[in-house]
């Protein structure tokens, strides 16, 4: 079910529970319903979902490693700036949005996004742990979303963050 249909089903109380992206859907739905919802974070139950990711083709990464590193450094700087001043980050984002977002919702979206970086202590923003990948892949395989689990280096690398 697509997210708009799922949201309609939830807001009309045809379903009682739905999964959402905390960084964008949750603030929008609460604003739309004018209700504060109870949130069950899967991380509270031991599953650290992989958050925002940058996907780069292997060939491009191999041919342009410095470009990938620059993109990751710029992205990390954006996250650090947003962490330091979420309201300023939301105002900057608002300038570039084709479809304007309610300022209050956008503030909450930025706040939720910066909380979801889940980089381990001492590691750069964007760093991902092998154990988190393994847990996510195992869940996908067990629930039928993935036919087989390949070696972890087929899915991600932290090499360009170093």
Language model features with spans:
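Short acidic-hydrophobic, aromatic-tinged amphipathic segments that line or gate anion-handling sites
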Residues: 1-2
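Pocket-lining segment of extracytoplasmic ligand-binding domains
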Residues: 5-9, 13-99
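Short loop/turn and capping residues at structural boundaries
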Residues: 21, 41, 105, 151-152
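Flexible, active-site-adjacent loop/turn segments at secondary-structure boundaries
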Residues: 27, 54, 58-59, 123-125, ...
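Short secondary-structure boundary/hinge segments and terminal tails
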Residues: 28, 47-48, 111-112, 157-159
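Secondary-structure end/capping motifs
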Residues: 62-143
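Conserved C-terminal helix/tail region of periplasmic/extracytoplasmic solute-binding proteins
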Residues: 133-162
């Amino acid at each position: 079910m697509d997210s708009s249909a799922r949201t309609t089903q939830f807001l009309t109380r045809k379903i009682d529970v739905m999964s959402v992206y905390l960084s964008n859907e949750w603030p929008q739905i609460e604003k739309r319903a004018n209700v504060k919802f109870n949130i069950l974070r899967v991380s509270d139950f031991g599953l650290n979902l992989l958050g925002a990711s940058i996907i780069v083709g292997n060939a491009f990464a191999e041919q342009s490693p410095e470009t990938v590193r620059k993109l990751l450094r710029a992205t990390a700087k954006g996250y650090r700036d947003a962490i330091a001043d979420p309201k300023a980050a939301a105002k900057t984002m608002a300038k570039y949005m084709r479809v304007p977002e309610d300022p209050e919702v956008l503030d909450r979206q930025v706040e939720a996004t910066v909380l979801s970086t889940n980089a381990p202590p001492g590691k750069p923003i964007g760093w991902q742990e092998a154990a988190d990948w393994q847990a996510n892949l195992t869940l996908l395989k067990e629930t039928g979303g993935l036919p087989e689990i390949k070696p972890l280096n087929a899915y991600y690398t932290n090499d360009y963050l170093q």
